[in-house]
Amino acid sequence: MLNKKQQAMYKDQRVGIFIDVQNLYYSAKNLYKAKVNFNEILKIAVGNRKLIRAFAYVIKTDELKEKTFFEALENIGFEIKSKDLQVFYGGMKKGDWDVGIATDAIELAPKLDVVVLVSGDGDFTPLVEHLQRVEGCKVEVIAFGKSSSSKLIEHVDNFYDLDINPRRFLI
């Protein structure tokens, strides 16, 4: 992990991974016109530590390709949590997993030493503070620094900036 507050990783640390797939997908698409290599993300998130659970939070649309994508995520070790894209009157669309990710992280925290959030969304800052202060967990974030909240980065124990070596994490 690369951060001003570099923390050591220990092989006995229990790790839970929570990936905001939409956040990472759109960051890679907008910054690099590429797709994310989720297998590489999983490898750096776990490191040499003990993986307890890894969740990928996805939004279902009507695209045929997404079923194959979701199966690929499962095949590399992610548990898929999905919800339908909400379409509101007037055409506005919303697919938001922030509360679901926060709830799952808080529920699993007593069984973890480290929570890894894969998202640069600043809305997770209160979650980070809660996990550190109340649950006693270290919190790491993996995201593209160019599209990440500086406030979120400031609060985490470790930040891995995918922009430092983007080719490793893109396909």
Set out the residue ranges of the language-model regions:
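Domain-level signal for Mg2+-assisted phosphodiester chemistry and nucleotide/NA-binding surfaces
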Residues: L2-W97, C137-K138
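Nuclease catalytic cores that cleave nucleic-acid phosphodiester bonds
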Residues: D62-I171
